[in-house]
Amino acid sequence: MLHRRIHFKSQSTLDFDSVAVSISASTMKNELDKLVLNSRVSDKKTFGIQMDNFFALYRRYLLHTVKGYECDWDSIRPLGPEDMIDYGDLPLCKNAGKYLNRLAVVKLNGGMGNALGVNYPKAMIEVRDNQSFLDLSIRQIEYLNRRYDVSVPFILMNSYDTNDETCKVLRKYAGCKIDISTFEQSRYPRVFVDSQLPVPKAAPSPIEEWYPPGHGDIFDALVHSGTIERLLAQGKDYLFVSNIDNLGASVDLNILSHVIDNQIEYSMEITDKTKADIKVGILVNQDGLLRLLETNQVPEQHREEFMSDKVFKYINTNNVWLYLPAVKRVVENRELNLDIMPNIETVYYNNEPARIIEFTTAIGSAISQFKKTEGIRVSRPRFISVKNSSDLFLVRCDLYNVDHGSLKIEESRLGFPPPVVRMSNEFKDIAELFCRIPYMPSMKDLVSLSISGNVYFGRNVILKGNIVIVASENTILCIPSNAVLENCVVTGNCKIMEC
Protein backbone atom coordinates (compact mmCIF):
# COMPACT_ATOMS: atom_id res chain seq x y z
CA MET A 1 0.00 0.00 0.00
CA LEU A 2 0.95 3.62 -0.30
CA HIS A 3 2.74 5.22 2.61
CA ARG A 4 0.01 6.61 4.86
CA ARG A 5 -0.53 9.41 7.34
CA ILE A 6 -2.56 8.21 10.32
CA HIS A 7 -5.49 10.15 11.75
CA PHE A 8 -5.08 10.45 15.51
CA LYS A 9 -7.85 8.74 17.45
CA SER A 10 -8.63 8.38 21.12
CA GLN A 11 -7.77 5.11 22.81
CA SER A 12 -11.46 4.30 23.29
CA THR A 13 -12.09 4.80 19.57
CA LEU A 14 -9.14 2.60 18.64
CA ASP A 15 -10.32 -0.13 21.02
CA PHE A 16 -13.82 0.00 19.53
CA ASP A 17 -12.42 -0.17 15.99
CA SER A 18 -10.25 -3.17 16.88
CA VAL A 19 -13.27 -5.01 18.25
CA ALA A 20 -15.30 -4.14 15.14
CA VAL A 21 -12.57 -5.46 12.86
CA SER A 22 -12.28 -8.65 14.87
CA ILE A 23 -16.03 -9.29 14.76
CA SER A 24 -16.37 -8.53 11.03
CA ALA A 25 -13.35 -10.67 10.16
CA SER A 26 -14.50 -13.57 12.32
CA THR A 27 -18.00 -13.47 10.84
CA MET A 28 -16.66 -13.39 7.29
CA LYS A 29 -14.27 -16.28 7.99
CA ASN A 30 -17.12 -18.41 9.33
CA GLU A 31 -19.23 -17.72 6.23
CA LEU A 32 -16.35 -18.53 3.88
CA ASP A 33 -15.59 -21.75 5.74
CA LYS A 34 -19.23 -22.78 5.27
CA LEU A 35 -18.99 -22.02 1.55
CA VAL A 36 -15.92 -24.24 1.19
CA LEU A 37 -17.29 -27.05 3.37
CA ASN A 38 -20.60 -27.26 1.52
CA SER A 39 -19.28 -26.47 -1.95
CA ARG A 40 -19.95 -28.74 -4.90
CA VAL A 41 -17.22 -27.35 -7.14
CA SER A 42 -15.03 -29.75 -9.10
CA ASP A 43 -11.76 -28.55 -7.56
CA LYS A 44 -12.44 -28.03 -3.88
CA LYS A 45 -8.78 -27.49 -2.99
CA THR A 46 -8.37 -24.59 -5.43
CA PHE A 47 -11.67 -23.10 -4.30
CA GLY A 48 -10.49 -23.26 -0.69
CA ILE A 49 -7.24 -21.49 -1.58
CA GLN A 50 -9.19 -18.76 -3.36
CA MET A 51 -11.45 -18.20 -0.35
CA ASP A 52 -8.39 -18.01 1.93
CA ASN A 53 -6.85 -15.40 -0.38
CA PHE A 54 -10.10 -13.47 -0.47
CA PHE A 55 -10.28 -13.46 3.32
CA ALA A 56 -6.72 -12.09 3.54
CA LEU A 57 -7.71 -9.32 1.13
CA TYR A 58 -10.91 -8.56 3.04
CA ARG A 59 -9.12 -8.44 6.38
CA ARG A 60 -6.51 -6.01 5.03
CA TYR A 61 -9.35 -3.86 3.72
CA LEU A 62 -10.96 -3.77 7.17
CA LEU A 63 -7.71 -2.82 8.86
CA HIS A 64 -6.93 -0.05 6.39
CA THR A 65 -10.47 1.31 6.63
CA VAL A 66 -10.93 1.55 10.39
CA LYS A 67 -7.50 3.04 11.02
CA GLY A 68 -8.57 6.06 8.99
CA TYR A 69 -5.55 6.11 6.68
CA GLU A 70 -5.20 8.77 4.04
CA CYS A 71 -2.69 9.09 1.23
CA ASP A 72 0.44 11.04 2.17
CA TRP A 73 0.60 13.17 -0.96
CA ASP A 74 3.69 15.02 0.27
CA SER A 75 5.79 11.86 -0.01
CA ILE A 76 4.94 11.40 -3.70
CA ARG A 77 6.99 12.95 -6.47
CA PRO A 78 7.00 12.63 -10.26
CA LEU A 79 9.57 10.37 -11.89
CA GLY A 80 12.89 11.94 -12.72
CA PRO A 81 15.50 10.70 -15.24
CA GLU A 82 17.17 8.72 -12.46
CA ASP A 83 13.95 6.78 -11.80
CA MET A 84 13.62 5.16 -15.21
CA ILE A 85 15.46 3.80 -18.21
CA ASP A 86 14.87 5.23 -21.67
CA TYR A 87 14.22 2.60 -24.33
CA GLY A 88 16.63 4.39 -26.68
CA ASP A 89 19.48 3.68 -24.27
CA LEU A 90 18.97 -0.09 -24.27
CA PRO A 91 21.58 -2.16 -26.13
CA LEU A 92 20.42 -4.05 -29.19
CA CYS A 93 19.63 -7.72 -28.71
CA LYS A 94 22.32 -9.77 -30.44
CA ASN A 95 21.10 -13.33 -29.93
CA ALA A 96 17.31 -13.43 -30.18
CA GLY A 97 16.93 -17.19 -29.90
CA LYS A 98 18.92 -17.38 -26.68
CA TYR A 99 16.56 -14.97 -24.93
CA LEU A 100 13.30 -16.07 -26.55
CA ASN A 101 13.88 -19.63 -25.38
CA ARG A 102 13.45 -18.33 -21.82
CA LEU A 103 10.22 -16.41 -22.50
CA ALA A 104 6.48 -17.05 -22.30
CA VAL A 105 3.74 -14.54 -23.14
CA VAL A 106 0.57 -13.98 -21.12
CA LYS A 107 -2.36 -11.92 -22.33
CA LEU A 108 -4.86 -10.65 -19.76
CA ASN A 109 -8.22 -11.82 -21.08
CA GLY A 110 -10.66 -11.27 -18.26
CA GLY A 111 -12.89 -8.60 -19.76
CA MET A 112 -16.18 -8.77 -21.60
CA GLY A 113 -17.11 -6.41 -24.42
CA ASN A 114 -19.97 -4.73 -22.57
CA ALA A 115 -18.46 -1.26 -22.90
CA LEU A 116 -18.63 -1.71 -26.68
CA GLY A 117 -22.16 -3.07 -26.69
CA VAL A 118 -21.49 -6.81 -27.06
CA ASN A 119 -22.06 -9.65 -24.59
CA TYR A 120 -19.06 -11.82 -25.46
CA PRO A 121 -15.36 -11.62 -24.51
CA LYS A 122 -13.66 -8.46 -25.65
CA ALA A 123 -10.83 -10.50 -27.16
CA MET A 124 -13.25 -11.70 -29.87
CA ILE A 125 -14.23 -8.24 -31.12
CA GLU A 126 -13.17 -7.67 -34.71
CA VAL A 127 -10.52 -4.97 -34.80
CA ARG A 128 -9.62 -4.73 -38.49
CA ASP A 129 -9.13 -6.89 -41.57
CA ASN A 130 -11.66 -9.39 -40.13
CA GLN A 131 -9.28 -10.15 -37.26
CA SER A 132 -10.05 -9.98 -33.54
CA PHE A 133 -7.77 -9.00 -30.67
CA LEU A 134 -7.16 -12.72 -30.11
CA ASP A 135 -6.38 -13.36 -33.79
CA LEU A 136 -3.83 -10.55 -33.88
CA SER A 137 -2.17 -11.67 -30.63
CA ILE A 138 -1.73 -15.23 -31.88
CA ARG A 139 -0.41 -14.01 -35.24
CA GLN A 140 2.31 -12.09 -33.38
CA ILE A 141 3.54 -15.19 -31.57
CA GLU A 142 3.23 -17.37 -34.66
CA TYR A 143 5.45 -14.98 -36.62
CA LEU A 144 7.94 -14.64 -33.75
CA ASN A 145 8.34 -18.40 -33.41
CA ARG A 146 8.68 -18.92 -37.14
CA ARG A 147 11.17 -16.10 -37.69
CA TYR A 148 13.54 -17.08 -34.88
CA ASP A 149 12.87 -20.84 -34.88
CA VAL A 150 11.78 -20.85 -31.23
CA SER A 151 8.73 -21.94 -29.25
CA VAL A 152 7.41 -19.07 -27.15
CA PRO A 153 4.25 -20.29 -25.37
CA PHE A 154 1.10 -18.15 -25.68
CA ILE A 155 -1.03 -18.13 -22.53
CA LEU A 156 -4.36 -16.48 -21.73
CA MET A 157 -5.42 -15.54 -18.23
CA ASN A 158 -9.21 -15.82 -18.47
CA SER A 159 -11.90 -14.91 -15.98
CA TYR A 160 -14.97 -17.05 -15.30
CA ASP A 161 -16.80 -14.64 -17.64
CA THR A 162 -14.50 -15.28 -20.60
CA ASN A 163 -13.14 -18.79 -20.04
CA ASP A 164 -15.76 -21.00 -21.72
CA GLU A 165 -16.20 -18.86 -24.85
CA THR A 166 -12.45 -18.36 -25.22
CA CYS A 167 -11.69 -22.08 -24.98
CA LYS A 168 -14.28 -22.78 -27.69
CA VAL A 169 -12.74 -20.21 -30.04
CA LEU A 170 -9.22 -21.53 -29.42
CA ARG A 171 -10.16 -24.78 -31.15
CA LYS A 172 -9.77 -23.08 -34.52
CA TYR A 173 -6.05 -22.66 -33.78
CA ALA A 174 -5.53 -26.38 -33.21
CA GLY A 175 -3.45 -26.61 -36.39
CA CYS A 176 -1.13 -23.75 -35.43
CA LYS A 177 2.35 -24.69 -34.33
CA ILE A 178 2.06 -22.71 -31.11
CA ASP A 179 1.89 -23.87 -27.51
CA ILE A 180 -1.44 -22.24 -26.56
CA SER A 181 -2.85 -22.68 -23.07
CA THR A 182 -5.10 -20.93 -20.57
CA PHE A 183 -5.50 -20.57 -16.85
CA GLU A 184 -8.33 -18.97 -14.94
CA GLN A 185 -8.04 -16.17 -12.44
CA SER A 186 -9.76 -16.41 -9.08
CA ARG A 187 -13.47 -16.00 -8.43
CA TYR A 188 -14.23 -13.95 -5.32
CA PRO A 189 -17.61 -13.44 -3.61
CA ARG A 190 -19.33 -10.09 -3.73
CA VAL A 191 -20.06 -8.67 -0.28
CA PHE A 192 -23.17 -6.88 0.96
CA VAL A 193 -22.16 -3.42 2.19
CA ASP A 194 -24.69 -3.31 5.03
CA SER A 195 -24.21 -6.76 6.55
CA GLN A 196 -20.59 -7.30 5.43
CA LEU A 197 -21.56 -10.87 4.53
CA PRO A 198 -20.76 -12.65 1.27
CA VAL A 199 -23.55 -12.58 -1.30
CA PRO A 200 -23.30 -16.27 -2.35
CA LYS A 201 -24.64 -18.83 0.10
CA ALA A 202 -23.47 -21.81 -1.91
CA ALA A 203 -20.86 -22.77 -4.49
CA PRO A 204 -21.43 -22.99 -7.33
CA SER A 205 -24.08 -20.27 -7.52
CA PRO A 206 -25.14 -17.66 -10.13
CA ILE A 207 -22.15 -15.80 -11.55
CA GLU A 208 -23.75 -12.48 -10.62
CA GLU A 209 -22.85 -13.27 -7.01
CA TRP A 210 -19.12 -13.40 -7.78
CA TYR A 211 -16.52 -11.14 -9.38
CA PRO A 212 -13.03 -11.40 -10.92
CA PRO A 213 -10.59 -9.64 -8.55
CA GLY A 214 -8.58 -7.70 -11.16
CA HIS A 215 -5.33 -8.51 -12.92
CA GLY A 216 -3.37 -8.23 -9.67
CA ASP A 217 -4.64 -11.77 -9.09
CA ILE A 218 -2.25 -13.02 -11.78
CA PHE A 219 0.46 -13.80 -9.24
CA ASP A 220 -1.67 -16.13 -7.12
CA ALA A 221 -3.34 -17.60 -10.20
CA LEU A 222 -0.02 -18.39 -11.90
CA VAL A 223 1.17 -20.32 -8.86
CA HIS A 224 -2.02 -22.10 -7.80
CA SER A 225 -2.97 -23.11 -11.35
CA GLY A 226 0.38 -24.87 -11.74
CA THR A 227 1.29 -22.62 -14.68
CA ILE A 228 4.54 -21.41 -13.12
CA GLU A 229 5.80 -24.93 -12.39
CA ARG A 230 4.97 -26.02 -15.94
CA LEU A 231 6.80 -23.05 -17.47
CA LEU A 232 9.86 -23.41 -15.26
CA ALA A 233 10.05 -27.10 -16.16
CA GLN A 234 10.20 -26.00 -19.82
CA GLY A 235 13.05 -23.57 -19.09
CA LYS A 236 10.79 -20.53 -19.36
CA ASP A 237 11.70 -18.21 -16.49
CA TYR A 238 10.58 -14.83 -17.87
CA LEU A 239 7.08 -13.67 -18.64
CA PHE A 240 5.79 -10.80 -20.76
CA VAL A 241 2.31 -9.77 -19.61
CA SER A 242 -0.01 -7.29 -21.31
CA ASN A 243 -3.68 -6.50 -21.87
CA ILE A 244 -5.15 -8.28 -24.87
CA ASP A 245 -6.72 -4.99 -25.98
CA ASN A 246 -3.32 -3.25 -26.21
CA LEU A 247 -2.52 -3.66 -29.89
CA GLY A 248 0.99 -2.26 -29.48
CA ALA A 249 2.11 -4.78 -26.87
CA SER A 250 4.33 -7.16 -28.83
CA VAL A 251 7.48 -8.93 -27.66
CA ASP A 252 10.41 -6.52 -27.80
CA LEU A 253 13.80 -8.21 -28.03
CA ASN A 254 15.78 -5.27 -26.68
CA ILE A 255 13.66 -5.10 -23.53
CA LEU A 256 13.74 -8.88 -23.14
CA SER A 257 17.53 -9.12 -23.36
CA HIS A 258 17.90 -6.13 -21.03
CA VAL A 259 15.73 -7.56 -18.22
CA ILE A 260 17.41 -10.97 -18.48
CA ASP A 261 20.98 -9.64 -18.60
CA ASN A 262 20.33 -7.35 -15.63
CA GLN A 263 18.33 -9.92 -13.64
CA ILE A 264 15.34 -7.60 -13.30
CA GLU A 265 12.48 -9.17 -11.31
CA TYR A 266 9.78 -6.71 -12.37
CA SER A 267 9.90 -4.20 -15.22
CA MET A 268 7.02 -1.90 -16.15
CA GLU A 269 6.81 -0.12 -19.49
CA ILE A 270 5.73 3.50 -19.15
CA THR A 271 5.03 6.05 -21.86
CA ASP A 272 4.42 9.78 -22.17
CA LYS A 273 1.01 10.97 -21.02
CA THR A 274 -1.32 12.65 -23.52
CA LYS A 275 -4.60 14.50 -23.07
CA ALA A 276 -6.40 11.19 -23.65
CA ASP A 277 -4.69 9.59 -20.62
CA ILE A 278 -5.69 11.87 -17.75
CA LYS A 279 -7.26 9.04 -15.73
CA VAL A 280 -4.70 6.32 -16.49
CA GLY A 281 -2.52 5.08 -13.60
CA ILE A 282 0.93 6.60 -13.26
CA LEU A 283 4.29 5.44 -11.94
CA VAL A 284 5.65 7.66 -9.16
CA ASN A 285 8.54 7.78 -6.72
CA GLN A 286 7.42 7.51 -3.11
CA ASP A 287 10.04 7.55 -0.41
CA GLY A 288 12.61 6.30 -2.91
CA LEU A 289 10.50 3.40 -4.20
CA LEU A 290 8.64 3.02 -7.49
CA ARG A 291 4.89 2.80 -6.94
CA LEU A 292 1.81 2.70 -9.12
CA LEU A 293 -0.78 5.37 -8.34
CA GLU A 294 -4.34 5.02 -9.63
CA THR A 295 -6.95 7.77 -9.86
CA ASN A 296 -9.09 6.47 -7.01
CA GLN A 297 -6.09 6.51 -4.65
CA VAL A 298 -5.54 10.24 -5.07
CA PRO A 299 -7.06 12.71 -2.56
CA GLU A 300 -9.76 14.82 -4.18
CA GLN A 301 -7.83 18.06 -3.72
CA HIS A 302 -4.92 16.66 -5.73
CA ARG A 303 -6.85 15.07 -8.62
CA GLU A 304 -6.14 17.95 -10.99
CA GLU A 305 -2.41 17.72 -10.29
CA PHE A 306 -2.53 13.93 -10.77
CA MET A 307 -4.21 14.28 -14.18
CA SER A 308 -1.86 17.00 -15.42
CA ASP A 309 0.56 15.98 -18.16
CA LYS A 310 2.84 18.80 -17.03
CA VAL A 311 3.43 17.35 -13.54
CA PHE A 312 3.09 13.57 -13.87
CA LYS A 313 4.29 12.92 -17.39
CA TYR A 314 4.37 9.12 -17.63
CA ILE A 315 1.60 6.53 -17.52
CA ASN A 316 1.51 2.80 -16.92
CA THR A 317 1.03 0.81 -20.15
CA ASN A 318 0.37 -2.42 -18.21
CA ASN A 319 3.12 -4.05 -20.26
CA VAL A 320 5.01 -5.94 -17.55
CA TRP A 321 8.06 -8.22 -17.62
CA LEU A 322 8.33 -10.70 -14.75
CA TYR A 323 10.98 -13.11 -13.46
CA LEU A 324 9.01 -16.24 -12.63
CA PRO A 325 11.15 -17.55 -9.72
CA ALA A 326 10.61 -14.16 -8.05
CA VAL A 327 6.85 -14.43 -8.60
CA LYS A 328 6.91 -17.89 -7.04
CA ARG A 329 8.89 -16.54 -4.08
CA VAL A 330 6.62 -13.58 -3.24
CA VAL A 331 3.47 -15.70 -3.51
CA GLU A 332 4.69 -18.67 -1.49
CA ASN A 333 6.21 -16.40 1.18
CA ARG A 334 3.03 -14.28 1.27
CA GLU A 335 5.05 -11.13 0.55
CA LEU A 336 2.47 -9.52 -1.75
CA ASN A 337 0.37 -6.73 -0.26
CA LEU A 338 -1.15 -5.12 -3.33
CA ASP A 339 -3.11 -1.89 -3.11
CA ILE A 340 -6.80 -2.63 -2.63
CA MET A 341 -9.29 -0.81 -4.83
CA PRO A 342 -12.79 -1.15 -3.33
CA ASN A 343 -15.71 -0.63 -5.68
CA ILE A 344 -19.27 -0.13 -4.41
CA GLU A 345 -22.26 -0.45 -6.71
CA THR A 346 -25.99 -1.06 -6.49
CA VAL A 347 -27.34 -4.27 -8.01
CA TYR A 348 -30.63 -6.13 -7.83
CA TYR A 349 -31.07 -9.38 -5.91
CA ASN A 350 -34.53 -10.95 -5.75
CA ASN A 351 -35.87 -7.79 -7.43
CA GLU A 352 -34.61 -5.66 -4.55
CA PRO A 353 -31.77 -3.10 -4.79
CA ALA A 354 -28.69 -3.97 -2.75
CA ARG A 355 -25.36 -2.23 -2.31
CA ILE A 356 -22.43 -4.57 -2.81
CA ILE A 357 -18.68 -4.11 -2.62
CA GLU A 358 -15.84 -5.71 -4.59
CA PHE A 359 -12.13 -5.61 -3.77
CA THR A 360 -9.76 -5.62 -6.75
CA THR A 361 -6.01 -5.31 -7.22
CA ALA A 362 -3.79 -4.34 -10.16
CA ILE A 363 -0.68 -6.04 -11.52
CA GLY A 364 1.07 -2.67 -11.61
CA SER A 365 0.90 -2.17 -7.85
CA ALA A 366 3.22 -5.16 -7.41
CA ILE A 367 6.21 -3.14 -8.63
CA SER A 368 6.94 -2.12 -5.04
CA GLN A 369 6.85 -5.74 -3.85
CA PHE A 370 9.83 -7.13 -5.79
CA LYS A 371 13.55 -6.77 -5.08
CA LYS A 372 14.89 -5.43 -8.38
CA THR A 373 12.42 -3.30 -10.33
CA GLU A 374 12.45 -0.59 -12.96
CA GLY A 375 10.35 1.53 -15.26
CA ILE A 376 11.25 1.60 -18.96
CA ARG A 377 10.12 4.63 -20.94
CA VAL A 378 8.88 3.39 -24.31
CA SER A 379 7.42 5.16 -27.32
CA ARG A 380 3.68 5.60 -27.71
CA PRO A 381 3.23 2.86 -30.36
CA ARG A 382 3.70 0.27 -27.58
CA PHE A 383 0.50 1.51 -25.97
CA ILE A 384 -2.42 1.34 -28.41
CA SER A 385 -5.18 0.51 -25.97
CA VAL A 386 -8.80 -0.01 -27.02
CA LYS A 387 -11.19 0.72 -24.16
CA ASN A 388 -14.17 2.27 -25.99
CA SER A 389 -15.65 2.93 -29.43
CA SER A 390 -13.51 6.04 -29.91
CA ASP A 391 -10.37 3.93 -29.49
CA LEU A 392 -11.70 1.25 -31.84
CA PHE A 393 -12.54 3.89 -34.44
CA LEU A 394 -8.99 5.22 -34.23
CA VAL A 395 -7.19 1.87 -34.64
CA ARG A 396 -9.26 1.03 -37.73
CA CYS A 397 -8.15 4.13 -39.64
CA ASP A 398 -5.25 4.66 -42.05
CA LEU A 399 -2.98 5.88 -39.25
CA TYR A 400 -2.11 2.25 -38.62
CA ASN A 401 -1.10 -0.84 -40.56
CA VAL A 402 -1.10 -4.46 -39.39
CA ASP A 403 2.34 -6.09 -39.52
CA HIS A 404 2.33 -9.79 -38.56
CA GLY A 405 -0.38 -9.15 -35.98
CA SER A 406 1.16 -5.97 -34.56
CA LEU A 407 -0.30 -2.54 -35.17
CA LYS A 408 2.29 -0.15 -36.61
CA ILE A 409 1.74 3.59 -36.86
CA GLU A 410 2.37 5.46 -40.11
CA GLU A 411 5.97 6.71 -40.34
CA SER A 412 4.77 10.28 -40.83
CA ARG A 413 3.21 10.16 -37.32
CA LEU A 414 6.18 8.66 -35.48
CA GLY A 415 7.15 10.86 -32.56
CA PHE A 416 3.75 12.56 -32.43
CA PRO A 417 0.89 11.71 -30.06
CA PRO A 418 -2.11 9.94 -31.61
CA PRO A 419 -5.21 12.01 -32.36
CA VAL A 420 -7.60 12.60 -29.49
CA VAL A 421 -11.04 11.26 -30.49
CA ARG A 422 -14.21 11.85 -28.50
CA MET A 423 -17.64 10.55 -29.48
CA SER A 424 -21.06 10.97 -27.91
CA ASN A 425 -23.25 8.09 -26.72
CA GLU A 426 -24.75 7.64 -30.19
CA PHE A 427 -21.45 5.95 -31.12
CA LYS A 428 -20.98 3.95 -27.91
CA ASP A 429 -21.93 0.53 -29.31
CA ILE A 430 -19.99 -1.16 -32.09
CA ALA A 431 -23.11 -1.72 -34.17
CA GLU A 432 -23.98 1.98 -34.07
CA LEU A 433 -20.40 3.01 -34.77
CA PHE A 434 -20.20 0.89 -37.93
CA CYS A 435 -23.68 1.96 -39.03
CA ARG A 436 -22.88 5.65 -38.71
CA ILE A 437 -19.34 5.40 -40.09
CA PRO A 438 -19.39 2.42 -42.48
CA TYR A 439 -16.36 3.74 -44.39
CA MET A 440 -13.31 4.83 -42.44
CA PRO A 441 -12.22 8.42 -43.11
CA SER A 442 -8.57 9.25 -43.73
CA MET A 443 -7.03 10.57 -40.51
CA LYS A 444 -3.29 10.73 -41.21
CA ASP A 445 -3.22 14.47 -40.51
CA LEU A 446 -5.83 14.57 -37.74
CA VAL A 447 -4.99 16.17 -34.39
CA SER A 448 -8.34 15.91 -32.61
CA LEU A 449 -11.91 14.94 -33.45
CA SER A 450 -15.08 15.50 -31.44
CA ILE A 451 -18.39 14.09 -32.72
CA SER A 452 -21.71 14.66 -30.97
CA GLY A 453 -25.26 13.78 -31.90
CA ASN A 454 -26.96 12.03 -34.80
CA VAL A 455 -24.02 12.10 -37.23
CA TYR A 456 -23.28 9.90 -40.27
CA PHE A 457 -20.27 9.73 -42.60
CA GLY A 458 -20.11 9.08 -46.35
CA ARG A 459 -17.25 7.54 -48.33
CA ASN A 460 -13.72 8.88 -48.77
CA VAL A 461 -13.94 11.58 -46.10
CA ILE A 462 -10.63 13.23 -45.14
CA LEU A 463 -10.10 14.74 -41.67
CA LYS A 464 -7.22 17.12 -40.89
CA GLY A 465 -6.22 19.21 -37.90
CA ASN A 466 -8.82 19.86 -35.19
CA ILE A 467 -12.40 18.93 -36.10
CA VAL A 468 -15.66 19.38 -34.19
CA ILE A 469 -18.89 17.90 -35.59
CA VAL A 470 -22.16 18.57 -33.73
CA ALA A 471 -25.62 17.64 -35.00
CA SER A 472 -28.46 19.90 -33.89
CA GLU A 473 -30.97 18.32 -31.53
CA ASN A 474 -33.54 16.07 -33.23
CA THR A 475 -31.78 16.38 -36.59
CA ILE A 476 -29.41 14.31 -38.74
CA LEU A 477 -26.02 15.62 -39.80
CA CYS A 478 -24.39 13.70 -42.65
CA ILE A 479 -20.84 14.35 -43.76
CA PRO A 480 -20.97 13.95 -47.56
CA SER A 481 -18.76 11.58 -49.52
CA ASN A 482 -15.39 12.99 -50.62
CA ALA A 483 -15.61 15.82 -48.06
CA VAL A 484 -12.34 17.29 -46.80
CA LEU A 485 -12.62 18.80 -43.32
CA GLU A 486 -9.67 20.76 -41.94
CA ASN A 487 -9.55 22.79 -38.71
CA CYS A 488 -13.27 23.45 -38.69
CA VAL A 489 -16.51 23.21 -36.74
CA VAL A 490 -19.46 21.55 -38.49
CA THR A 491 -22.86 22.08 -36.87
CA GLY A 492 -26.57 22.06 -37.71
CA ASN A 493 -28.30 19.52 -39.91
CA CYS A 494 -27.36 18.40 -43.37
CA LYS A 495 -28.50 15.37 -45.35
CA ILE A 496 -27.05 15.69 -48.83
CA MET A 497 -25.73 12.20 -49.31
CA GLU A 498 -26.78 8.58 -49.20
CA CYS A 499 -26.49 7.46 -45.58
Curated annotation (Swiss-Prot):
Function: Plays a central role as a glucosyl donor in cellular metabolic pathways.
Keyword Kinase recorded: no
One cellular component (GO) term of this entry: nucleus
Name of the molecule in the record: Probable UTP--glucose-1-phosphate uridylyltransferase
Main location: cytoplasm
Residues binding UTP, per UniProt: 108-111, 122, 185, 214, 245, 387
Pfam family, one: UDPGP
Subcellular location: Cytoplasm; Nucleus
Keywords on record: Cytoplasm, Nucleotidyltransferase, Nucleus, Transferase
Similarity remark: Belongs to the UDPGP type 1 family.
Catalytic reaction list: alpha-D-glucose 1-phosphate + UTP + H(+) = UDP-alpha-D-glucose + diphosphate
Annotated binding of substrate, by residue: 110-111, 215, 243-245
CDD domains per the UniProt record, alphabetical: UGPase_euk
Signal peptide from the UniProt entry: none
GO BP term, pick one: UDP-alpha-D-glucose metabolic process
Lineage of origin: Eukaryota, Fungi, Dikarya, Ascomycota, Taphrinomycotina
